[in-house]
Design a protein with these regions (language model features):
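Non-cysteine beta-strand/loop elements that form the S-adenosyl-L-methionine
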Residues: 43-50
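Catalytic cores of alpha/beta
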Residues: 30-41, 82, 86-105
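Extended, intrinsically disordered, low-complexity segments
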Residues: 122-128
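Active-site-adjacent beta->alpha loops and helix N-cap segments on the catalytic face
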Residues: 1-18, 31-36, 53-73, 89-93, ...
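Generic alpha-helical hydrophobic packing signal
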Residues: 13, 43, 70, 75-76, ...
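Short beta-strand/loop segments at the ligand-binding rim of alpha/beta enzyme cores
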Residues: 16-29, 74-83
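Flexible, glycine/proline-enriched loop segments at strand-loop-helix junctions
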Residues: 22-23, 59, 106
Length: 128
């Protein structure tokens, strides 16, 4: 539900009518959400919320060689944007190889505290 109890389907139809030339990206958490966004006609399908919602906690986008992304790519007509936990060059390369239109690298390059934590976590495990 959206504000005022409106369903996504109805909300998106209204917005699409009001802004017919605007590109719309769906930030999704599950394969089901991505398939639904594709059916609704979102221009871009994002994996942005995988692992970040109550229903997907503990899910990692890279599991089983990016099974979520592979499942979506086989079943949608709109471009898929890999976003969320794409935090290494190897992951970015792999999602492009699988067929994603683009990849978004967020926190791992834009938040110094995240970058620093990755280094300190690795270094605190070093035995002297």
């Amino acid at each position: 539900l959206r504000p005022n109890g409106e369903f996504l389907d109805d909300f998106f139809k209204e917005v699409r009518l009001k802004y017919p030339d605007q590109l719309f990206m769906a930030d999704c958490a599950s394969v089901q959400e991505m398939l639904h966004a594709d059916e609704l006609g979102f221009d871009l399908i994002g994996t942005t919320l995988v692992g970040y919602t109550d229903d997907t906690t503990g899910t990692h986008i890279e599991e089983d060689d990016f099974a979520i992304i592979r499942a979506v790519l086989k079943n949608v007509t709109h471009p898929v944007i890999a976003e969320g936990n794409i935090d290494t060059p190897a992951k970015a390369k792999r999602v492009i190889e699988l067929g994603c239109f683009s990849v978004v690298i967020g926190s791992s390059i834009t938040r110094p505290q995240v970058i620093t934590k990755r280094f300190t976590d690795a270094l605190t495990k070093v035995e002297k």
